[in-house]
Curated annotation (Swiss-Prot):
UniProt protein name: Uncharacterized protein YDR391C
UniProt keywords, alphabetically: Cytoplasm, Nucleus
Organism domain of life: Eukaryota
Cellular compartment(s): Cytoplasm; Nucleus
Other known facts: Present with 6020 molecules/cell in log phase SD medium.
Predominant location: cytoplasm
UniProt GO cellular component terms: cytoplasm; nucleus
Length: 232
């Protein structure tokens, strides 16, 4: 899933001195990766909601962002099909599931599983033809404390799009904010499903509310020949 984390706009692709930023590495350093992601998502109620559901933590329980971030990305380091990438000494971090994929963690909450896993999996199968695999971007975040470094998120997308293109793969992600959706559209992703989750559990700020509207998110998919091969 890709959460609301104030991603830079598409034009923010240079550092403060006008120098293109483009150093990407794979990493197994869970501590550093979790640190960046916890900064990126510290003020994201959707991040906390989703992670608490997956980790089966009561919604009303206060848990440090660093703690749930570390726990939520650990399966990707433990699996041969998981991959964590970082750019510019952890200025940005992305967590990936590669074919044949890290099994999606399921919550004890059947409704959440339906809304956020089962319905989306079914839609992905409708959109992506048989014979085409896909990369799944679980989450991506920028260190918002490093305002002078730009282009890190762009570098991640450009590299993984290049890899996916070479392998004739699609890329799948969930965007939970309009701003993030706009950024992903710039990078060639299209929205194939708008969906709700957390209804009658929380309000849009993540506060427990039995009448709450929950959150709105978007299932977005990229393929180099998307207009030709992806199904509406």
């Amino acid at each position: 899933m890709s959460f609301e984390n104030k991603l830079p706009t598409p034009l923010e692709n240079n550092d403060a001195k006008g120098h293109m930023v483009c150093t990407l590495n794979k990493t197994t350093d869970a501590r550093r990766a979790a640190e960046t992601l916890s900064i990126a998502f510290s003020n994201s109620p959707a991040f906390h909601f989703i992670c608490k559901k997956i980790l089966n933590i009561p919604l009303a329980e206060k848990v440090p962002t660093r703690t749930i971030t570390t726990d939520i990305i650990s399966p990707f380091l433990d699996s041969p099909y998981g991959e964590i990438s970082e750019v510019n000494t952890f200025d940005a971090v992305a967590v990936w599931s590669l074919p044949p994929h890290v099994p999606k963690a399921r919550s004890n909450d059947a409704k959440f599983n339906k809304d956020f896993i089962d319905d989306l999996n079914a839609r992905v199968k409708q959109v992506i033809p048989n014979g085409i695999n896909y990369y799944y971007l679980f989450c991506i975040g920028k260190n918002l404390n490093e305002k002078g470094i730009r282009g890190s998120v762009r570098t991640i997308f450009e590299e993984y799009k290049r890899r996916a293109d070479e392998e004739n793969c699609a890329i799948v992600l969930e965007a939970i904010a309009e701003h993030a959706k706009s950024v992903y559209e710039y990078f060639g992703f299209r929205n194939y499903m708008t969906f709700k989750y957390g209804e009658c559990e929380v309000d849009s700020n993540g506060n427990c509310d039995p009448n709450g509207e929950g959150f709105t998110a978007y299932l977005m998919i990229y393929h180099k020949d998307g207009n030709k091969v992806l199904k509406e």
